[in-house]
């Protein structure tokens, strides 16, 4: 495409965009046409095109390419003000990016600290629960030992009671045996005494008869 054809197409597009059509209403409108001067399209340098691609993407780059293709005579360089503006934009971008990263880091630290505290609280709760369980185990074993001791104590008491009753029975048996032995001894003594008295009486009688016979 030649430069004249490109310029003509550009002028036609500009006229079509700025043309005000007449609407079908009850009012009268006047079409206004403005004569557009034939100004060569500017040429965007590679640096500006690259910055435009970073900021707005491929669309701006394509538009810049179309514009730059229309003229090869006009070159537009970034002014110091534009460079300062771009530098400020870059600095603002760096600050905002740093702020985003710092907020993200603080968020991570906050969540980590909250999780750590929660984990510590849970660990402390588990530790106390384990201590309680250990104390319950001790009390359980103590209860078993005390129960065993009480059981053995009751068994010993029962055996002692049984032994005492056995001793009481043996004592009664011994008493009964002693009483029976004493009664047998008394009978023998009485019997022996009775026999001796009878013999003595007989002798007496015999002597008396002898004495009587002598007197006669």
UniProtKB/Swiss-Prot annotation:
Its main location: cytoplasm. Residues 1-34, 66-91 are annotated as: Disordered. It is found in: Cytoplasm. Residues 152-170 are annotated as: CAHS motif 2. Residues 1-11, 25-34, 68-77 have a biased composition (Polar residues). It comes from the Eukaryota. Belongs to the Cytosolic-abundant heat soluble protein (CAHS) family. This is Cytosolic-abundant heat soluble protein 2. The gene is CAHS2.
